[in-house]
Amino acid sequence: MPGKALILVENLSVPFDRRVWQESTTLRDAGWEVHVICPQGTKRDTEREVEIDGVKIHRYPLRAATGGPLGYLSEYGSALWHTYRLAKRIGPVDVVHACNPPDLFYLIGRRLKRRGASFIFDQHDLVPELYLSRFDRGQDFLYRLVCRLERATYRTADVVIATNESYREVAQSRGGKKPDEVFVVRSAPAIERFHSVPPDESLKRGKPYMLCYLGVMGPQDGVDYALRSLARLRDEQGRTDWHAAFVGGGDTFDAMVALSKELGLADFVDFTGRIPDEDLLRYLSTADVCLSPDPLNPLNDVSTMNKVMEYMAMGRPIVSFDLREAKVSAGEAALYAPPNDESEFAKLIALLLDDPEERRRMGELGQARVHGPLSWENSRKALLAAYDAARP
């Protein structure tokens, strides 16, 4: 029963958004005509119109928000206008597949539902929890607004795609969706993308060990916790036999570089920014321990972290804070410090540096998980089942 699917994304370009790209190619392989509307990237994904491997991608210019919550009103308003404009140009579709944040695409979904389309809500983030975690404003007017937008999105959705069981529970309890209307499509690394390459010892800057952080650097991502933990690794554990690489970019990149200098870590850490895949593989293949420092907050506790999945795909042992979904994802492939306890986080890093056999065992367990129960093959089946349910 394949037809024409329109996927809407606002916060990343495609195919840089790996989850959306996996979903797009899975649908293409199942016979769907797939269109994606997303923002243009700044250094990659810059073409306005492009077809890649049979997926038609329509991009629009977007300036990222600055200046706190009100800055997002301008960003999201612009994104909504461009998305609506491009959707009109694409014409009738059978399924509108909206990825959040923000929880605004239901406005387009409602219009297209009146023309016969089904609406799938792919909930990448719990936006109310994201708001509380990112902005220290409490349950103010804007918080109540994002709650209303989430409820409207749930009401509009024929089917909800959740990234894990915690999100599924929210869709049923807070969103009022029936169990057969919610499908768990876990984010999973593309196994063919993550493979070991020979370690590059020069990345260790002459030290015996290398630590690595991979991912976005936003206010809720915990890079500041990682840096303070590394300062404690040096000061409390007396360890200076390591070098650390922080791979990725984001809103707090400059602030984190400044914090590393304040902590006296300038000679211990490198910040690479976003790098090509071949360089990413060199860093992960060289790393002895990988860091997942996301602090406990309302969002992180129930979210699946892509970096954890990617560390496991590369067979790297992980140090994480003790978060609900982190333990579901990594299992015994990680050691867990009490939430937000930087001293314990540092102790666990030191423990793994001194135990190469445990590092090897944990890495093998992680690889087995992403090749088995957490593989994209299982997610592929759930995605296609969600589409079948949306178009009975």
Which ranges hold each PLM region?
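N-terminal subdomain of nucleotide-sugar transferases
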Residues: 1-56, 159
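Membrane-proximal helix-turn-helix segments that form the acceptor-binding/catalytic region
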Residues: 25, 84-85, 107, 111-115, ...
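Conserved donor-binding/catalytic core segment of Leloir-type glycosyltransferases
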Residues: 161, 204-230, 245
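Carbohydrate-associated surface elements
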Residues: 166, 187-188
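Nucleotide-sugar-dependent
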Residues: 221, 278-283, 292-313, 319-328
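Nucleotide-activated donor-binding/catalytic signature segment of Leloir-type glycosyltransferases, i.e.
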Residues: 247, 254-281
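Conserved acidic donor-binding segment of nucleotide-sugar-dependent glycosyltransferases
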Residues: 334-343, 351-357
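A short, well-ordered alpha-helix in the C-terminal region of glycosyltransferases
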Residues: 351, 358-373, 382-385
